[in-house]
UniProtKB/Swiss-Prot annotation:
Residues 22-564 are cytoplasmic. Residues 99-159, 243-281, 310-498 form a coiled coil. Keywords: Cell cycle, Cell division, Cell membrane, Coiled coil, Membrane, Septation, Transmembrane, Transmembrane helix. This is Septation ring formation regulator EzrA. It is a single-pass membrane protein. The keyword Repressor does not apply. It comes from Bacillus licheniformis (strain ATCC 14580 / DSM 13 / JCM 2505 / CCUG 7422 / NBRC 12200 / NCIMB 9375 / NCTC 10341 / NRRL NRS-1264 / Gibson 46). GO terms for cellular component: plasma membrane; septin ring. The chain crosses the membrane at residues 3-21. Belongs to the EzrA family. One of its GO terms (biological process) is septin ring assembly. Disulfide bonds: none annotated. Signal peptide: none annotated. Negative regulator of FtsZ ring formation; modulates the frequency and position of FtsZ ring formation. Inhibits FtsZ ring formation at polar sites. Interacts either with FtsZ or with one of its binding partners to promote depolymerization.
Length: 564
């Protein structure tokens, strides 16, 4: 039973698969059939009828005959073949020969694609032929009008073209021959060939129109404008030489010689080769070179004018620097009597003097060359600019040195003022200790006080020495300031601690009669207090009172910090 069911299932699967394959093949056959009908219905004959009004000779006749043959072949050969193959594909599908059916359908696809491509080529060639005829008919009149206009202009202004007149006229004759060839091709039905001829004449006319417009300008530039500019530049150059300008670095004569050679090359390109683009490019380079030379000469004139104004200005500035140097030398000698200058500080003055000496030598050399006119103004201008920068640097160096000298006196005054403040701080600290209830001063603080007093005394002695060494004074003064500040801080802390201990003990006295242990602890704190062991006295008293009255010490400390 199971075997029968299996066979039945297999049969159903095979039947379903065959059905699906046949369905897909029938669908493809229908598509190709529709494509074939579409090709057969294409209006090729109608499209070919569009050229009936053209001259049916030459290329037109050849095209028409070929198109008709190709269309007849499609209709009478390709399409019947396709119809036959469609029946074959359907028959193979009915007999379950699916592989063979697919091969036939692929062959049909290729035949229809080839026919479609052939038809598209025919339609494009028809459109090109019709379009060429229409464009030729419109544009030939424009070309003839332009030809007439160009020839009239050439005749009217023939004197402007010189030797080029014959070449341009020969090109115009070529255009006319081209127009006649166009008419012959059109008459012979060769519309596409006529189109090529017409476009060639159109391009040649554009080129000739460019010649008509540009040749007179270029000839004028080569024959008149540029030679005049070169002559003008040469005259200006000679005038500057006569006035004493040194212009060897510009090499104007060599440049002018090169310009004349380039001008000859531009004329040859124009007259011999009728190469307007090359001639125009050469003329442009010549114009730019002339302008560059003018700019260089003008720069030389401007440099000369600037130098004539700058030299007296720098001379006056150098005299001022020299006077400042002498004043500073005198001031240095005066300062050296009262202050000890370091080697580095003295070297700054020597460096400034050497720099000034070098600047004066360089400036004198420039003045000599200027008087003898041995060098171009533009080169001297650069040297003067360098000298001016050096003078500015020397002035800054001098100002820094002067500021340093003045700073020494200012530092001395500041040191004396700070020393006065430190001495007063020591006195105030001692007075504060005397006024307080401190039973005695710990040895560590006493030693710091002695050190600060000794250091302050040494600073005082250094300030009274001549010459004064401010570096040593400032170093010792900084040490004294640190010691005095430390003494004042520790003294203030000591006074505050003593007052706090007294308050804690006084507060604890109210519990002495009630607490024997507290009484003994306070007694111990008092002993430490009068033995100058203040930290230990505070710890003992604070622990005892805090035990008897929690939070009391914190309240007492807060009250002690409140201003009275």
């Amino acid at each position: 039973m199971e075997f029968v069911i299996g066979l039945l299932a297999l049969f159903l699967i095979l039947f379903a698969t065959g059905y699906l394959f046949r369905k897909n093949i029938y669908k493809e056959i229908d598509r190709l059939e529709a494509w074939k009908i579409e090709i057969m219905n294409r209006s090729i004959v109608e499209e070919m009828s569009k050229i009936k009004h053209l001259k049916m000779t030459g290329q037109t006749e050849e095209f028409f005959e070929r198109w008709r043959r190709e269309w007849d072949e499609i209709v009478t050969s390709h399409m019947p073949k396709v119809e036959e193959l469609l029946f074959e594909a359907e028959d193979c599908a009915d007999k379950y020969r699916f592989q063979k059916s697919k091969q036939v359908l692929a062959h049909i696809e290729n035949l229809l694609s080839a026919a479609e491509s052939n038809i598209e080529d025919i339609l494009k060639e028809i459109a090109d032929l019709v379009s060429s005829e229409e464009q030729n008919r419109k544009e030939i009149e424009e070309v003839k009008e332009r030809y007439t206009k160009v020839r009239k202009n050439l005749l009217a202004y023939s004197h402007l073209y010189g030797d080029l007149y014959a070449k341009i006229e020969a090109d115009l004759d070529t255009v006319w021959e081209g127009i006649k060839q166009f008419e012959e091709e059109t008459e012979g039905g060769n519309y596409i060939e006529a189109r090529k001829v017409l476009l060639a004449q159109d391009r040649l006319l554009e080129e000739l129109q460019s010649y008509i417009d540009d040749v007179p300008k270029l000839l004028a530039s080569c024959k008149q404008t540029v030679p005049q500019e070169i002559a003008k530049l040469k005259a200006g150059y000679q005038e500057m030489i006569d006035k004493g300008y040194k212009l060897d670095h510009i090499q104007v004569e060599k440049e002018l010689e090169n310009l004349l050679k380039e001008l000859k090359r531009a004329e040859d390109a124009l007259l011999d080769e009728l190469d307007l683009e090359e001639a125009a490019a050469i003329v442009q380079i010549i114009d730019e070179t002339i302008q560059t030379l003018y700019n260089q000469l003008e720069h030389e004139v401007e440099a000369g004018q600037e130098i004539l104004g700058k030299v007296p200005e720098l001379a006056a500035a150098l005299e001022k620097l020299e006077a400042s140097k002498k004043d500073t030398e005198a001031e240095t000698e005066l300062v050296k009597k009262g202050y000890r200058l370091t080697t580095g500080e003295l070297e700054k003055q020597q460096s400034y003097e050497k720099r000034l000496e070098m600047i004066e030598k360089q400036f004198e050399q420039v003045r000599e060359r200027l008087d003898q006119k041995h060098v171009a103004y533009s080169l001297l201008k650069e040297e003067l600019a360098d000298i001016e920068k050096q003078m500015e640097a020397a002035q800054r160096e001098h100002d820094e040195y002067r500021d340093m000298l003045q700073m020494l006196r200012k530092e001395e005054l500041q040191a004396r003022e700070l020393l006065k403040q430190l001495k007063q701080t020591i006195k105030d600290t001692a007075r504060s200790l005397e006024k307080s209830n401190v039973p005695g001063i710990p040895e560590a603080i006493t030693e710091k006080i002695r050190q600060s007093q000794t250091t302050v005394q040494k600073v005082t002695e250094q300030l009274n020495e001549l010459p004064l060494n401010m570096d040593a004074v400032n170093e010792r003064l900084q040490e004294a300031e640190q010691l005095v500040t430390e003494v004042k801080t520790k003294t203030d802390e000591l006074v505050e601690l003593v007052l706090l201990i007294e308050r804690i003990i006084q507060y604890g006295n109210r519990f002495r009669s009630q607490d024997r242990i507290l009484s003994e602890q306070l007694k111990e704190a008092e002993n430490c207090f009068y033995a100058y062991q203040y930290e230990e006295a505070y710890d003992i008293a604070a622990r005892a009172v805090e035990k008897a009255s929690p939070g009391a010490v914190a309240r007492l400390e807060a009250d002690a910090k409140q201003p009275e």
